Amino acid sequence: MSEKHPGPLVVEGKLSDAERMKLESNYLRGTIAEDLNDGLTGGFKGDNFLLIRFHGMYQQDDRDIRAERAAQKLEPRHAMLLRCRLPGGVITTTQWQAIDKFAADNTIYGSIRLTNRQTFQFHGILKKNVKPVHQMLHSVGLDALATANDMNRNVLCTSNPYESQLHAEAYEWAKKISEHLLPRTRAYAEIWLDQEKVATTDEEPILGATYLPRKFKTTVVIPPQNDIDLHANDMNFVAIAENGKLVGFNLLVGGGLSIEHGNKKTYARTASEFGYLPLEHTLAVAEAVVTTQRDWGNRTDRKNAKTKYTLERVGVDTFKEEVERRAGIKFEPIRPYEFTGRGDRIGWVKGIDDKWHLTLFIENGRILDYPGRPLKTGLLEIAKIHQGEFRITANQNLIIASVPESQKAKIETLARDHGLMNAVSAQRENSMACVSFPTCPLAMAEAERFLPSFTDKVEAILEKHGIPDEHIVMRVTGCPNGCGRAMLAEIGLVGKAPGRYNLHLGGNRIGSRIPRMYKENITEPDILASLDELIGRWAKEREAGEGFGDFTVRAGIIRPVLDPARDFWE
């Protein structure tokens, strides 16, 4: 990134209303406890509507029936989304059985949704079941604290089934970082777990009384796999190993994908390299990055509040030097690392510990019993007999991890019998969408419900041009907030209106380049016509091993985004 003209360290001006809300919330309590007992509405009112996000929930409604209910003079069918805190995506089979039961008994949709932030979500929790879901999670050692709003969100960690020892070490650091950066308020325990109020003053030594200016995302990544899409995240620890043992991390700061349609002050940005740090400085550096963003992030304009904008305003070097000062270290030069891919290896892989790992492709992460494919039942049956753990991947898939040779055949039989190992194309394996309609209030266009049939059509184009076994990293996101990570795809569709998308092209397979908008506000037939032409050219003109995104840049079809603060919108 270029150093333009470093701006002020702190943005002066009228604070956004979110800052007032946080300050007046009494460390995230608000009047949530009282609101829970209000049976006149299925939702949360006033500030509580936003405060529940700090407790891992979003208030939603079923948009498919919103107009129908309005015509009947009924309020929207309010229900909550709850997102679990699950560092590194590791969940025990006991925990899985508990969440399976809750989804079946206490949610409108009966499904478990794996997310590309390596955790699971429940959709459709009615207000009466909100407290029980938190208590259920607590009973099996889980919680939903800090999985939404202005905190450090769920910490990702590469789901690496090969280097078992290295994964174990990296995963422990993901957990340590997650715990270190958690809020200290007792609001969560008091409201949801009925723990007594303690007569002490709440303090937030890391996050502060008004928490962070905006959401903050952290990863621990083990090269050569970039499955966690580090450039979508504020703070990234890239594992550096010697002789198979973790010795330290390269730190990259300031990635982020969300934009606002037409707002040229917003842009997607890849993360900047700060340097290498030995393991013993990890928590101090993590805290220093977070507190620097806490103090310097823009609290007057939430559209410009993320770390990526702070870096561009103050300058990368200035931010880095402040992190060094706060952490009491000097970064060493970046150590060599390389990424070769970011997809999951579907199927069986043997780890170096002689245990087997079975990665199951779960289209769009939606676990439900479909006609002829009872996925949810199948995973429950596996959970009942499996001695190891499950790992949720950042590609919305699920790994049955650490399977001994003696159990391999039984687990494979269960998986096959329940439609969990059906053959799918490489293209489908490398396609992903956010939830969008009907539950997301921000959705502008379909995503999860659109992608399967759209993928069928892209597969047909690949077949037509003689490359059916090829794949293009393809993502669909229902709005420009970018949960589907379309801004790191080779083909990225960003919802603009019902049935209409902005088409972005020119990302790469390893997720290190932002795609540029190729066509704006177009329909599915227009998108497919463009892809038919370009994929045809790629099939004929590509160099050996050249991915679709790299081809579009080399062929001059797309001008690469090199400095997004300056050229993202050009």
Curated annotation (Swiss-Prot):
Pfam families: NIR_SIR (PF01077), NIR_SIR_ferr (PF03460). Siroheme binds at C483. One of its GO terms (molecular function) is 4 iron, 4 sulfur cluster binding. It catalyses: hydrogen sulfide + 3 NADP(+) + 3 H2O = sulfite + 3 NADPH + 4 H(+). Component of the sulfite reductase complex that catalyzes the 6-electron reduction of sulfite to sulfide. This is one of several activities required for the biosynthesis of L-cysteine from sulfate. InterPro entries: CysI, NiRdtase/SiRdtase_haem-b_fer, Nit/Sulf_reduc_fer-like_dom_sf, NO2/SO3_Rdtase_4Fe4S_dom, NO2/SO3_Rdtase_4Fe4S_prot, NO2/SO3_Rdtase_4Fe4S_sf, NO2/SO3_Rdtase_FeS/sirohaem_BS. Keywords: 4Fe-4S, Amino-acid biosynthesis, Cysteine biosynthesis, Heme, Iron, Iron-sulfur, Metal-binding, NADP, Oxidoreductase. Pathway: Sulfur metabolism; hydrogen sulfide biosynthesis; hydrogen sulfide from sulfite (NADPH route): step 1/1. This is Sulfite reductase [NADPH] hemoprotein beta-component. NCBIfam families: CysI, PRK13504.1. GO terms for cellular component: sulfite reductase complex (NADPH). Belongs to the nitrite and sulfite reductase 4Fe-4S domain family. Binds 1 siroheme per subunit. It is an enzyme of class 1 (oxidoreductase). [4Fe-4S] cluster binds at C434, C440, C479, C483. One of its GO terms (biological process) is hydrogen sulfide biosynthetic process. Its cofactor is siroheme; [4Fe-4S] cluster. Alpha(8)-beta(8). The alpha component is a flavoprotein, the beta component is a hemoprotein. Its EC number is 1.8.1.2.
